Curated annotation (Swiss-Prot):
GO MF annotation, one: rRNA binding
GO CC terms in record: ribonucleoprotein complex; ribosome
Family label: Belongs to the bacterial ribosomal protein bL20 family.
Keyword NAD appears in the UniProt entry: no
Biological process according to GO: ribosomal large subunit assembly; translation
Gene from which the chain derives: rplT
Transferase is among the record's keywords: no
PROSITE patterns named among the record's database cross-references: RIBOSOMAL_L20 (PS00937)
Name used for this protein in its record: Large ribosomal subunit protein bL20
UniProt keywords, alphabetically: Ribonucleoprotein, Ribosomal protein, RNA-binding, rRNA-binding
Role summary: Binds directly to 23S ribosomal RNA and is necessary for the in vitro assembly process of the 50S ribosomal subunit. It is not involved in the protein synthesizing functions of that subunit.
PANTHER family noted in UniProt: 39S RIBOSOMAL PROTEIN L20
Coiled coil residues, start to end: none
Organism (species): Chlamydia felis (strain Fe/C-56) (Chlamydophila felis)
Length: 121
């Protein structure tokens, strides 16, 4: 009886790892032991940075809104507070896009936020 080696599955597994390591430098792209650890590390960084990206974009939207709201005579925090008082439920991404692509529309929204702030004071 012939010994079962599992060579097909092993080759497939190694091939998959080496394919993922394509573009790595030195032994990391061609030797399975180096490639495996490098690919695992790359996947860990990939996972972390996918989570980080969400916060990075939120920070970008807030920075854009701060600039746009100051052009319209409000700080970012007063803009957000005014929008809540006015009952305007636009999220930061939508507001940021509006500030870039439709400044007149953003100015109207900012004025509504201003009026709502003045009404509460």
């Amino acid at each position: 009886m012939v010994r079962a080696t599992g060579s097909v599955a092993s080759r497939r597994r190694r091939k998959r790892i080496l394919k993922q390591a394509k573009g790595f430098w030195g032994d990391r792209k061609g030797h399975i032991r180096q490639s495996r650890s490098s690919v695992m590390r790359a996947m860990a960084f990939n996972y972390m940075h996918r989570k980080d990206r969400k916060g990075d974009f939120r920070s970008l939207w807030i920075a854009r809104l701060n600039v746009a709201s100051r052009i319209n005579g409000l700080s970012y925090s007063r803009l957000i507070n005014g929008l809540k008082c006015a009952g305007i439920e636009l999220n930061r991404k939508m507001l940021s896009e509006m500030a870039i692509h439709n400044p007149q529309g953003f100015a109207e929204v900012a004025n509504q936020a201003k009026k709502a702030l003045e009404a509460t004071v």
